[in-house]
Amino acid sequence: METKGYHSLPEGLDMERRWGQVSQTVEHSSLGSTERTDENNYMEIVNVSCVSGAIPNNSTQGSSKEKHELLPCLQQDNNRPGILTSDIKTELESKELSATVAESMGLYMDSVRDADYSYEQQNQQRSMSPAKIYQNVEQLVKFYKENGHRPSTLSCVNRPLRSFMSDSGSSVNGGVMRAIVKSPIMCHEKSPSVCSPLNMTSSVCSPAGINSVSSTTASFGSFPVHSPITQGTPLTCSPNVENRGSRSHSPAHASNVGSPLSSPLSSMKSSISSPPSHCSVKSPVSSPNNVTLRSSVSSPANINNSRCSVSSPSNTNNRSTLSSPAASTVGSICSPVNNAFSYTASGTSAGSSTSRDVVPSPDTQEKGAQEVLFPKTEEVESAISNGVTGQLNIVQYIKPEPDGAFSSSCLGGNSKINSDSPFSVPIKQESTKHSCSGTSFKGNPTVNPFPFMDGSYFSFMDDKDYYSLSGILGPPVPGFDGNCEGSGFPVGIKQEPDDGSYYPEASIPSSAIVGVNSGGQSFHYRIGAQGTISLSRSARDQSFQHLSSFPPVNTLVESWKSHGDLSSRRSDGYPVLEYIPENVSSSTLRSVSTGSSRPSKICLVCGDEASGCHYGVVTCGSCKVFFKRAVEGQHNYLCAGRNDCIIDKIRRKNCPACRLQKCLQAGMNLGARKSKKLGKLKGIHEEQPQQQQPPPPPPPPQSPEEGTTYIAPAKEPSVNTALVPQLSTISRALTPSPAMILENIEPEVVYAGYDNSKPDTAENLLSTLNRLAGKQMIQVVKWAKVLPGFKNLPLEDQITLIQYSWMCLSSFALSWRSYKHTNSQFLYFAPDLVFNEEKMHQSAMYELCQGMHQISLQFIRLQLTFEEYTIMKVLLLLSTVPKDGLKSQAAFEEMRTNYIKELRKMVTKCPNNSGQSWQRFYQLTKLLDSMHDLVNDLLEFCFYTFRESQALKVEFPAMLVEIISDQLPKVESGNAKPLYFHRK
């Protein structure tokens, strides 16, 4: 009883994986019929090309038994290498091997017949008669029986040949029959090592009706070359290559192999076919969806290398089908002379594309052969994720061995990536570094797309800040462009047009702040770190919007200020009502202003749902209570980690130190609540005098005849009598006081951009402080520009005053922020940069930090108000002048005197200072004098770090470079003169 071995692998699966795992050697051996048992008779199927008339089309039960006896065993050995000898054998020995091929084909037909699969015939094949073919096979079998069987080796012109046979499977009844190629044929001298794929036969059917494709065997000269090629058309050999040992079919030599039990016209079960037949062969190689046609012939002229099937003997790590002795690189078919072979890879999304390459070979030219044309057809029908990946531009590099040459090719713009490639290891795909997406790229990328990262410390004027003192105070700097778009990208990258068409500001109604305008169009918004709602605009429209001193009444307010009623009246963004009825209560107006369309808010500290604006920041109730208790209780929290704990809804109670730091960074301060209460009280006091004013006198009678006095109704007042006094009263009420103006023009808090991931070294902290000071100075200059009376001074005097007082203004503002946000416990440089005792030591300026901290403690002792702070800040701007005086000294003295009087009025108006106004005024002016001593020490340290900036690795922004460069020689020469209120 005959035993057939089957491997239970699904059809069409695991084929290409096994193709890449073919063993590196093949052992050719022939076993006698006496040594063969039924257990050794595996279903060994080979897909080879046969000479015309050499393979039978019909077979019988009796002849199949003879074929079992004649079948030699060509066994793969994956463990030990089998190197063929280089002795040239006789032609008879090669015929014996051919007989082995014929017998194995007979076994193949028996197995196919037993499987009893029905294969659909697509085209009628031109064939010989089955009886004639079978007769030829019987003659060959008898001839081989007479000569016996003995092991034979294959050699080619004294060159060792190492064949890598692929292990293909043909699924029968759910199993897989192993197929081993057993046709080593003699190489004729006229057949050079380089041969065109004209000899390669194929069993690929037409794409319309193909069910499965068998692994083909291509004849390389007279060698069988195995690769997963599926050539669409079997072509004849070139004239210079002898076809004597070839197993390739031309259309004239086509033969059909079929089952003796079925008609050749109904079921074709041969793995070899000519182009007219297009027979369907059941094989687990691939389905029509993953058929990949690979050309496997190239020459040194070709430098396009995509798929390889052959490697040299020294390259034992590459999986291939046939190697040439001298071929040391990866190629499909290598000549003994050539060192690098490749072939073009063309895989279009539509189907197959044909390219013709002229491949000259050194050997063929010596033999008198001319150029050989190789038509190569490749087809890729499966792309990555079943999607078209055109314009992908992937370079496929075949990694060579150390002793081999390297050749690579770049696929075309329409190439796809074949995800079913059998070469799982040797081929490495990398994206092109200069991919141009199928078009010619002519853009020159910028050398440094981020010009602000320059390491030079004295080239700031051209790098970071485009503002200067004269540019901000005087006319705008020509050529300044706040929009940085396109500066860091090459020309070839497509950029979206920034025409502002999505957010036309002229057509945005005031109600757009809630998210949807009256037309139903939605707008994007975001809530910033301090509760700022800002619409999405272009970069050029957003430049320094928070610095506009006097915004129009009808514009949208972008910040929720914490000073008085300004935030409650303007932050809603609704249009101003022209007429408010007297009977409408304030609660009704409040409910109207807070509509249901207001976007939901989240806590800026922990991310929980916010309950309102607490201490100047939109937070939840939990963070509100925590901040109040932490600041008023003066708790000194310490972090167990690195002061970078995650604060969210779940973990906000884990680390109170980091939670308090995040509250401070968000901008929470106790002064916001106090200023709000003061604003309400101020509004009540302003309403009482207006109610006590007597009504205007009645107008005189219209005519002298009337004895009674006629009072005109309120809706129709007399122009000459009633309207003029009312307008004068309104004009006086609408005239803003200097304190109100200073409150409105106060700059917003600036973020330092501190990176917590970097170590807290002295150079990092000082560089961060300098960058923060540069940002703050831009705001200071803009603040001084709109300061009442400051614009009346000449431009040179304005610049001089700012250069002399910039350090004093910065340190005074720092003390105020520390007093307002941290109750003078820390130094509040910025929301993201708060100095504790540890950072004061790390900054190498601990004593200076303690001096600024003492000023902040004086604010607590004096309970300084915001109105007093703003006026004292203006006096500090006017507290240092040159020794020679200013150009307009009289205007300067007048301006300074007016602000001193305003401070005196502010102290007198304060109800808490009744009877002690002069004493408080003395304390405030004494505090201003103490600022000069602190500033002298700060300037000395600043000038030292400025000189040694390169050695200390401390960065200075452009604004500070301009100010310090002009101030340093004047201060060191003694030209600066501080103005004191009290003699020392």
From Swiss-Prot:
Chain residues that bind 21-hydroxyprogesterone: 770, 776, 817, 945
TM spans (from-to): none
Region described as Hinge: spans on this chain: 669-725
Modulating, as annotated region: 1-602
UniProt cross-references to CDD domains, sorted A to Z: NR_DBD_GR_PR, NR_LBD_MR
GO molecular function: DNA-binding transcription factor activity; sequence-specific double-stranded DNA binding; steroid binding; TBP-class protein binding; zinc ion binding
Gene Ontology biological-process entries: positive regulation of non-canonical NF-kappaB signal transduction
InterPro entries (UniProt xref): NHR-like_dom_sf (IPR035500), Nucl_hrmn_rcpt_lig-bd (IPR000536), Nuclear_hormone_rcpt_NR3 (IPR050200), Znf_hrmn_rcpt (IPR001628), Znf_NHR/GATA (IPR013088)
Residue sites binding Zn(2+) 1 per the record: 603, 606, 620, 623
Compartments where located: Cytoplasm; Nucleus; Endoplasmic reticulum membrane
Comment on protein domains: Composed of three domains: a modulating N-terminal domain, a DNA-binding domain and a C-terminal ligand-binding domain.
Function field: Receptor for both mineralocorticoids (MC) such as aldosterone and glucocorticoids (GC) such as corticosterone or cortisol. Binds to mineralocorticoid response elements (MRE) and transactivates target genes. The effect of MC is to increase ion and water transport and thus raise extracellular fluid volume and blood pressure and lower potassium levels.
Name of the featured protein: Mineralocorticoid receptor
Source organism of the structure: Aotus nancymaae (Ma's night monkey)
